[in-house]
Amino acid sequence: MTRFRWLMILGRICISFLLFFSISSHSETAPDRTTFTMAYSADPAGSLTMAWYHRLISEAFDRLGISLDYRVYPPLRAATLLKTGKIDVEGLRDASYADDNPDAIIVRESILTTTYGMATLDPEIELKRLADFQHKPYRVEYLRGVEPLGDILKDVVTEGYLSAITSPEQGLQKLLAGRSDVFVDFPGRISALIESMDLSLAGIQVNEFEDDIVVYPVLHRRHVDLAQPLQQVLSEMKAQGLFEQYMEETRKVFLLPHDQ
């Protein structure tokens, strides 16, 4: 095992302990506090970006007197749980998410601007933007429930060449089996999955699209009265420089240099 991989594993263990003690401290010091359940599509214990995001959003809710617990679900499952009121918050959705989800209340203070990426085995497939799929004969797959990715791809991928799958593992497996040409998802999740599935020598290329996607926290509509206070708290934290401070601190836990 390489030294870098050992460092990554050590970093993830540290993140797991930090998340555990963060949750434990809330429950011990304030047992009567309200606790919200938040849905993520990637585990903060294994993702630099999600660990940073979870620290920020947890503090924001903490300032409002609310403890935050989280669960990891596929995007479509998370949307269903929010619709039925079985979770309180979703972590990362774009502004148009509420258009098709009337139970979703967008908190209009962006924490993160993200990008999509693609995995392929074909070195001749070179795409810089999602719009570059137009008029290409590529069999494209994406993870069901990741929006607005699905809507974007439906507009640009050749009819009959686009399909939705239920897990990112399935996306890589079908790619390796020659049943698809491109798998589109978040590049960080793809890269982490390649490592966890021990596919680093499989020849899978991961490239990031140039399109920027701005994402927001989402509340269930029963918490609509919290949308404005949460927006204000996040705005204050951003002005206080905590977004940058916490990112640097999280990078140190993950043992990554500043430019990664």
Where are the language model's segments positioned?
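Extracytoplasmic small-molecule ligand-binding "clamshell" domains
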Residues: 28-103, 164-165, 230, 249-250
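Short loop->beta-strand "edge-of-pocket" segments that line small-molecule binding or catalytic clefts
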Residues: 31-47, 130-148
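Extended ligand-binding regions for polar small-molecule ligands
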Residues: 54-63, 123-127, 131-139, 216-249, ...
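Ligand-binding clefts/hinges and TM-proximal coupling segments of bilobed small-molecule sensing domains
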Residues: 67, 144-160, 235-260
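Acidic, polar ligand-binding/catalytic clefts
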Residues: 71-135, 144-148, 208-209
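Short helices/loops that flank or line small-molecule/ion binding pockets
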Residues: 76-88, 155, 168-189, 196-197
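A ligand-binding cleft/hinge motif common to bilobed small-molecule-binding domains
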Residues: 80, 92-102, 181-210
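Periplasmic-binding protein-like
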Residues: 112-117, 195-234, 254-259
